[in-house]
A protein has these predicted regions:
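Short acidic/glycine-rich loops and adjacent helix/strand connectors
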Residues: 1-194
Length: 194
């Protein structure tokens, strides 16, 4: 890539506590400048609604039976993501060229070849007036992964940046724990439990 772009990444994990945002400048290869990070806690009412909805969705059939509730909650989650976008733009006085939107995981079944995240990328793009990339988990599963494609790449590049020569194991403990093993130019990653 011959120019640097400003990218904003949004992540809300299965712990359902809130949204993490990181804004960076990068050439997509060697150069990366972390401009800043921000966290926005879900308000108790929204968190409760997400948890209650997630607890009653155990299959795609459950989701189809609750589509109106899904759409209403998805809109609220998307608007909450727009709030953190506005906050991070204001705090660091910069706008992103592109946004990576994870969405809120409500059902993750990689062995059954699907993962469902709440979040309307089209609405977020309209609200933020920025292009949005999304469906990271779904695309990873379609390509044989377990639905966490970005963490292993980050861990592998972190090992290179820190100039660690020995094999390294990164453990990410969240709502769904996962690990990344990295040795030389080889790396692999898997979910490790709930």
């Amino acid at each position: 890539m011959d120019k640097n772009i400003v990218a904003l990444g949004l992540m809300s994990g299965t712990s359902m506590d809130g949204i993490d945002a990181s804004i960076i400048r990068s050439d997509g290869d060697e150069y990366i400048d972390i401009i800043g990070n921000l966290y926005l806690k879900y308000d108790p009412e929204l968190k409760k609604k997400i948890q209650e909805f997630t607890n009653k969705i155990n299959s795609l059939e459950d989701l189809k039976s609750n589509v109106e509730e899904y759409k209403n909650l998805e809109r609220k989650i998307t608007i909450k993501h727009q709030e953190i976008i506005s906050e991070i733009y204001k705090k660091f006085e910069i706008r992103a060229n592109i946004i990576g939107f994870h969405g809120q995981t409500i059902l993750h079944k990689p062995l059954q070849n699907f993962s469902i995240q709440m979040g309307n990328a089209e609405l977020l793009s309209q609200l933020s007036k920025t292009d949005v990339v999304y469906q990271f988990r779904q695309n990873d599963i379609k390509n044989g992964g377990q639905g966490a494609p970005l963490t292993p790449i980050y861990h592998h590049n972190l090992k290179k940046k820190l100039n660690l020569k020995m094999p390294v194991l990164f453990l990410n403990i969240g709502g769904i724990a996962n690990y990344t093993f990295s040795k030389n130019d080889y790396f692999c990653a898997k979910d490790a439990g709930p």
